[in-house]
Amino acid sequence: MESRIAIVGANGVGKSTLLKLLVGKLELTSGNSYRNGRLSLSMFTQHHIDQLKLPLSPLEQFMTDFPGATQETYRSHLGSFGITGNLALRPNYLLSGGQKSRVAFSLAMWKNPHILVLDEPTNHLDIDAVNALIVALNNYNGGVIIVSHDQHLVSTVCEEIWYIKDTRLKKFAGDFEDYRRMLSMGKL
């Protein structure tokens, strides 16, 4: 379960919809899907900041969303995402966009899911936050499925490229550079 997969394709072909189907945020309108009942998935989206409870601090949000651990455990987890010291006590609405993204990513990672599903995760991130995300994903022991137009993220994190065209998901035999080259030549 340590696969690193990028799903690419033109805007509007259904990449985000596919991810929502995978994590159960949407239901199929036809056909069947099967998933191991013990499989845990977590999703981090381009709208990740929307999941934050803005009046709460990151520490308070963890205590509310995932009760039962010690403050030290929450703070240690937040610290591994760069939310340290007084930052963990500051209301979410006072955090920068990059800091909010780190809090949201730490929330997605709390239960150590088997597979992390990311939908345009670098939107709204500064370069430092993008690099921190890349390091975190490369150190992550589970599987990763990413929808992104960010060539640096995909090239640095993903080992497989899958593309959607004409409502079909197909594995691409090559890396992201090869995919872009084939696309520019009109061969996909």
Which residue stretches match the model-derived regions?
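ABC ATP-binding cassette signature C-motif
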Residues: 1-188
